[in-house]
Amino acid sequence: MSDAARPLDPDEAARRLGPWLGAGGQAGGVVLAVSGGPDSTALMGCAAALPPRVPVLVATVDHGLRPESGEEAAGVAALAGRLGLPHRILTWRGEKPRTRLQEAARAARYDLLLGLAREAGAGAILTAHTLDDQAETVLMRLCAGSGPAGLAGIAPARRLGGLLLGRPFLDLPKARLVATCAAAGWPFAVDPGNAAARFARARLRRVMPLLAAEGLTPARLARLAARLRRNEAALAAAAEAARPSLAAAPAGPGRLALDAAGLAALPEAVALRVLADAIAALRAGERRPERLERLEEALFGRILPAIAAGTPLRLTLGGALLDLAGGRLLLAPEPPRRRTKRAG
């Protein structure tokens, strides 16, 4: 049996889950996100076998997108009961969008999980994302034209609404979790949507073996993501360090002002991050950031040349109005557009 398809042994599972679930783990306990697929089923089974542990609550989100989803959620509940773990089914209610369905389902899933974790007083949510998920995410974002932040992929751990979101299996091939379920006799479901050609992730999944044959393996894609996460951390620190020296005269409520010459003197990557962060600060609460291509075109194609030439500039970008004049770049929320009434 190859290492890529070897089941997790109890010691390895304990090393991965111990920091989260062990006696010194998250205060208040942990919520496990378990869909019923092999990855999350392995997470649940391994967690149940780990003594001593903090309180563990298993949660299954029923998105209501497939007729069999309710039955699958009930199957997770039954297995959780046999393993001695409490279980809750969370239902995504309301009308489902016609576009960006997977994106909307993901947002709803995390909202429901976060709500349950807060209700239970849990300190963290664990998901069973794998090396395969990481590789597919990096490839999808590469196809979408993402920059370093997007290509950094899925973080092993991050903050989510004041809690921790952890992914203890992120560097494991999916085949190992499938093998773990098979060895333990834990039943799991297979979502047919994972192979549906209408979804970009499923289409890319089909070509992954061809890419791997050329050397672009899931492990190498995941390694690229790890390297870019390190670079992103350094870039964020550089932008944070530069920000105080860029503060221009007070800009007024709800506005930001940057010293134009100071912005132009920064390394391009740092200047781009400073601009992106400034726009994001004006758009607090909005989930979707401005596309990197537009930021690059605005900064490198218009703003920096105008600073060098000493000419004023006015443009809108990402919901912000940018006004370059008097040696400073003023950023303000873009005013709402007026609708003109048609005559007659």
UniProtKB/Swiss-Prot annotation:
**Keywords of the record:** ATP-binding, Cytoplasm, Ligase, Nucleotide-binding, tRNA processing
Describe its function: Ligates lysine onto the cytidine present at position 34 of the AUA codon-specific tRNA(Ile) that contains the anticodon CAU, in an ATP-dependent manner. Cytidine is converted to lysidine, thus changing the amino acid specificity of the tRNA from methionine to isoleucine.
Per the record, the major location class is cytoplasm
Compartments where found: Cytoplasm
Q: Which HAMAP family match?
A: tRNA_Ile_lys_synt
Gene3D superfamilies found in the cross-reference section: HUPs
Report the GO terms under cellular component.
Answer: cytoplasm
Which molecular-function annotation in GO is an example for this chain?
Answer: tRNA(Ile)-lysidine synthase activity
What is the similarity comment for this entry?
Answer: Belongs to the tRNA(Ile)-lysidine synthase family.
Is DNA damage there in the keyword field? no
Domain description: The N-terminal region contains the highly conserved SGGXDS motif, predicted to be a P-loop motif involved in ATP binding.
What the entry lists under SUPFAM superfamilies is as follows:
Adenine nucleotide alpha hydrolases-like (SSF52402)
InterPro entries, per the entry: Rossmann-like_a/b/a_fold, TilS/TtcA_N, tRNA_Ile_lys_synt, tRNA_Ile_lys_synt_N
Root EC class = ligase
Protein's UniProt name: tRNA(Ile)-lysidine synthase
Question: Secretion signal: which residues?
Answer: none
Q: What is its EC number?
A: 6.3.4.19
Any idea which positions bind ATP?
35-40
Q: Which gene encodes it?
A: tilS
Q: Which organism is it from?
A: Methylobacterium sp. (strain 4-46)
One GO term of the biological process aspect: tRNA modification
Q: Which reaction does it catalyse?
A: cytidine(34) in tRNA(Ile2) + L-lysine + ATP = lysidine(34) in tRNA(Ile2) + AMP + diphosphate + H(+)
